[in-house]
Amino acid sequence: MIEYLKGAIVGLTPTNLVIECAGVGYDVNVSLTTYSAYQGKKEGLIWITQLIREDAHLLYGFSTKEERTLFGQLTSVSGVGPTTAQLILSSYAPQELAALITTGQADALKAVKGIGLKTAQRIIVDLKGKIQLETSSDEILSARTAVGDAALNTIASGEEAISALKMLGFADPAIRKAVKSILSEDSSLAVEDIIKRALRML
């Protein structure tokens, strides 16, 4: 099994990363969290989970071991496949997700597209005792009021963009994560520009 890949990053989208190692290019599935970590980088090391099926060999990549561990824990839950696990990790940063599971916030997990209440509750029941937080819940909640949140609260275009993206069928947590990131870089963007950029990330 592949533990990690290290080499030149030759392609990067919100869902996939192509990394060249010893002349071979590997197509790796990634979350928005990992995508953000490798933006602008020409080289990198990515931690790998390899899934072998009859019809395909799939690689899932993560910028940290912590995110990879969460991916493995999520896919161990009945009803949560790798695609759904990646969507959950795209909606919440690892520490945020760990806090939601530890504190039993099923409604927040249910907001992720494809996750129903029963599945959200199952994730909490199965993983609550396995999640180890390196920071307290208070620190995590405090972090969620940083620059991105301030931008959403003060700029009307951010809320308009969120509403429009919801109408397109995207999940609220993933939308807010994308829009916060966009506005933290440029808070003067018009609604249509925010939406266009968010669509490239969702």
Curated annotation (Swiss-Prot):
CDD domains cross-referenced by the UniProt entry: UBA_RuvA_C
GO cellular component, one term: Holliday junction helicase complex
Chain positions covered by the region annotation Domain III: 153-202
Chain spans, region Domain II: 64-142
Single biological process term from Gene Ontology: DNA recombination
Family under the similarity heading: Belongs to the RuvA family.
Function: The RuvA-RuvB-RuvC complex processes Holliday junction (HJ) DNA during genetic recombination and DNA repair, while the RuvA-RuvB complex plays an important role in the rescue of blocked DNA replication forks via replication fork reversal (RFR). RuvA specifically binds to HJ cruciform DNA, conferring on it an open structure. The RuvB hexamer acts as an ATP-dependent pump, pulling dsDNA into and through the RuvAB complex. HJ branch migration allows RuvC to scan DNA until it finds its consensus sequence, where it cleaves and resolves the cruciform DNA.
Name of this protein: Holliday junction branch migration complex subunit RuvA
